[in-house]
Amino acid sequence: MKLMLSLGSLSANSLPIEKKQQVLIDLVIRTYQSHERTELFKAITEYRKNQLIALFPEHANKSYSIIFELMDYRDLIERYPSTLSEEATLLEKVVGQCFMHWLDFWCECEIAAIKAKFPLKENELPAPQLLFEDSAYYGALVERVEDTQLMVQIPSHPQAMPLSDAITLSNLELFIQGEKWYEMLSLLSLSQVGKHFIVLKHPVQDSCPTLVASALIQNWSVRDTWLSYAPQFSNEQWNYCFPSYGYSEFTRLQLFTPSSLSKCYSLPEFDNEFKLQLSDTQAVCEVLRLTVSGNAQQKLYFLYLAQKELMSVLHQAGYKIGFTIIEQPFMLNFYRAIDAKAYFHSGYCDLNDDGKQTYRGFWNFEMMVKAFSNIDFRGYKRAVRASRKRGSLERDEHV
């Protein structure tokens, strides 16, 4: 009842939008326990997603960022009030007054909830200085982030916090707030548990190490939860493009029984044959959520450094092949400039019909380590520029 009164009062209040946003977020964080908040957000998300798909069935397979912007959110909740509960109806009404849509609000709540647990202190040391020197950082593989005692900070919030919270906050800021990958909101638990690769800045004068990059590493044993094998990423809409030398490289790496993977003609067929024939299951993993921090230039540097450290760390850990999903042009342009056997696509698809291709592919860790062994950030950028220029010339020739 107290929440209803607070929401009613806030709804009628003519506060500036940013102030109303903050008051609403604080109210929700104070009122609900973490698991209660998650259940509420998931319930309303599912309700509105199904409703929007019923209204616009031609967009049923699009991403949440497309689906939740098909209709003005305030118009949606006025024309189709929630039937979940009176509380949900009133909450959505206030959200509609100050946020783009429900998922935008969910993301901001999760970010605020983590920052509220570890508030910045006025007398703390200044934000860490992020150098463009490879030796100032180190990569590591953490088997279970939920069990580690390591405390770190991140550039956008220089306050010590558990590693799992730092990874989650980084994922929220980069992928959900930045890239609008709202599907990750209901899967935030994957950022808080399990095996993760991390890149840390050595704590020189800082109070604790600074997390500048991370990635989720999932073993073959949990392949049923892999994004690579989710229906959206393994269907006939994907263009199959696994190269002939990929088959040869897989044979050389001794991954299968029988030793040669059967030739395939579609991505679903390839995925099925891979699962049936794979015998060296310890050599294969999926790498997702490669997250980097900092401003635009720092992110490019940490993207280079994270890949360099990732390949080395996973190769040393005994992995041979890594499944990955990539949209990042900077990464793809670099891969075009190195040995073709170091990274190869298995398929590509324009998931949202917006002209942006998403690629499924494989990192060959042994070859990737060689590709990065004699290259620094300057050389990396030079290779990317040359690759981009070559690609532009090739496109011009076909016009």
Curated annotation (Swiss-Prot):
Its EC number is 2.3.1.184. GO terms for molecular function: N-acyl homoserine lactone synthase activity. It holds the Pfam family AHL_synthase. It comes from the Bacteria. Keywords: Autoinducer synthesis, Quorum sensing, S-adenosyl-L-methionine, Transferase. One of its GO terms (biological process) is quorum sensing. It catalyses: a fatty acyl-[ACP] + S-adenosyl-L-methionine = an N-acyl-L-homoserine lactone + S-methyl-5'-thioadenosine + holo-[ACP] + H(+). It is an enzyme of class 2 (transferase). InterPro entries: AHL_synthase. Required for the synthesis of an autoinducer molecule beta-hydroxybutyryl homoserine lactone, which binds to LuxN and thus acts in bioluminescence regulation. Belongs to the LuxM / VanM family. This is Acyl-homoserine-lactone synthase LuxM. It comes from Vibrio harveyi. The gene is luxM.
